[in-house]
């Protein structure tokens, strides 16, 4: 297990050390940390735990530093906690090299520095670049390209002509390039061949059991530094912009474009052939059925602006009561009409 002096961590992360130097052997929560572990405070609602915490040091902002005897002062405590965690985390896996139990087509090009576990399948004319790791059960179809420093976890599938950039993480069970949902609306529901492809740009992370489909023609694209949670469905021909976050169980229908720096919260549903602008936040379980311009915050189904959504959410539990009152008023008005009042 790695060990660091607190002063070493401060230097590596360019943080300010407050208090004396100690040896640190791990990372833990404020509640569970021991005197030789480091913790963090990123949310003020946990500030009461500072007094009770046994952590040897705490990563926190300058305004709270006086409350603890030993601290690493940070402008972004949660980010720097992640960086410290990386120092102590042990990489998954126990295999180096290229297994003779993997199938690699003779026309495939696999870097000597790649790690290919047993029972990986690599199809014809596929390229695997330097320092990329493929865990057991990964299937890579023909004419695929995987860039440098990627990690692809077990039982992931890349269908033919799928491309992944550099520094990507693809979690277990992901399927990239499966057929989009394309059928002619005839009595036979004839299948339309899906011969497009999927391109994943640099520094993308895709969570477990997410699917990104290819279309009839053209490309489904996930752009740089976008982060996708588990169990997300991205339809054929979709484009997702840079630095966008997509949370679990979101569904995006075919040929929709999502802009840069967007947040799609859990279980949001986006109809097909739409354009969602840049810097858009879509709340959980929202239903989007029209184009959305830049810089919007939306909620509800059908989705409306955030303020309207919050107001209607407050009113909704009162609807039965209000309905009764309206019916009562209607009866009073009817009686007045009958008596010409």
Curated annotation (Swiss-Prot):
Gene3D superfamilies assigned: Hexapeptide repeat proteins (2.160.10.10), MurE/MurF, N-terminal domain (3.40.1390.10)
UniProt GO MF annotations: N-acyltransferase activity
UniProtKB keywords: Acyltransferase, Lipid A biosynthesis, Lipid biosynthesis, Lipid metabolism, Repeat, Transferase
Active site: residue positions: 236 (proton acceptor)
Gene Ontology biological-process annotations: lipid A biosynthetic process
Purpose of the protein: Catalyzes the N-acylation of UDP-3-O-acylglucosamine using 3-hydroxyacyl-ACP as the acyl donor. Is involved in the biosynthesis of lipid A, a phosphorylated glycolipid that anchors the lipopolysaccharide to the outer membrane of the cell.
Lineage: Bacteria, Pseudomonadati, Thermodesulfobacteriota, Desulfovibrionia, Desulfovibrionales
Species the sequence originates in: Lawsonia intracellularis (strain PHE/MN1-00)
UniProt keyword annotation of Transferase present: yes
Reaction it catalyzes: a UDP-3-O-[(3R)-3-hydroxyacyl]-alpha-D-glucosamine + a (3R)-hydroxyacyl-[ACP] = a UDP-2-N,3-O-bis[(3R)-3-hydroxyacyl]-alpha-D-glucosamine + holo-[ACP] + H(+)
Segments crossing the lipid bilayer: none
GO CC annotation terms, alphabetical: membrane
EC number, UniProt record: 2.3.1.191
Protein name, as recorded: UDP-3-O-acylglucosamine N-acyltransferase
Pathway the protein takes part in: Bacterial outer membrane biogenesis; LPS lipid A biosynthesis
Superkingdom field: Bacteria
Family under the similarity heading: Belongs to the transferase hexapeptide repeat family. LpxD subfamily.
Pfam families: Hexapep, LpxD
NCBIfam families in the record: lipid_A_lpxD, PRK00892.1
Description of how the protein assembles with itself and partners: Homotrimer.
């Amino acid at each position: 297990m790695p060990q660091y002096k607190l002063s070493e961590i401060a230097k590596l992360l360019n943080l300010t050390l407050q208090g004396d130097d100690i040896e640190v052997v791990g990372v833990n929560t404020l509640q569970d940390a021991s005197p030789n572990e480091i913790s963090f405070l990123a949310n003020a609602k946990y500030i009461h735990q500072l007094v009770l915490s046994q952590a040897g040091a705490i990563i926190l902002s300058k305004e709270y530093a006086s409350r603890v005897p030993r601290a690493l002062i940070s402008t972004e405590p949660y980010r720097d906690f992640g960086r410290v965690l990386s120092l102590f985390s042990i990489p998954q896996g126990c295999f180096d090299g290229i297994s003779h139990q993997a199938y690699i087509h003779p026309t495939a090009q696999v870097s000597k520095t790649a790690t290919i576990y047993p029972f990986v399948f690599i199809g014809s004319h596929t390229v695997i670049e330097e320092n990329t790791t493929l865990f057991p059960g990964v299937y890579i179809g023909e004419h695929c390209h995987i860039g440098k420093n990627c990690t692809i976890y077990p039982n992931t599938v890349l269908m033919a002509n799928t491309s992944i950039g550099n520094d990507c993480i693809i979690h277990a069970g992901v399927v990239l390039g499966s057929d989009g949902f394309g059928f002619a609306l005839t009595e036979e529901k004839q299948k339309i061949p899906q011969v497009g492809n999927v391109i994943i740009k640099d520094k993308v992370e895709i969570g477990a059991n997410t699917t990104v489909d290819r279309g009839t023609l053209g490309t489904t694209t996930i752009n740089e530094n976008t982060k996708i949670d588990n169990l997300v469905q991205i339809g054929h021909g979709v484009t997702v912009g840079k630095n966008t976050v997509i949370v679990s169980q979101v569904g995006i229908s075919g040929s929709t474009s999502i802009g840069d720096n967007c947040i799609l919260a859990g279980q949001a549903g986006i109809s097909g052939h739409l354009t969602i602008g840049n810097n858009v936040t879509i709340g959980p379980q929202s239903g989007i059925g029209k184009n959305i311009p830049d810089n919007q915050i939306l909620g509800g189904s059908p989705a409306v602006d955030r303020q309207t959504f919050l107001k209607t959410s407050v009113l909704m539990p009162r609807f039965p009561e209000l309905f009764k009152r309206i019916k009562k008023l209607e009866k009073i008005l009817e009686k007045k009409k009958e008596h010409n009042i």
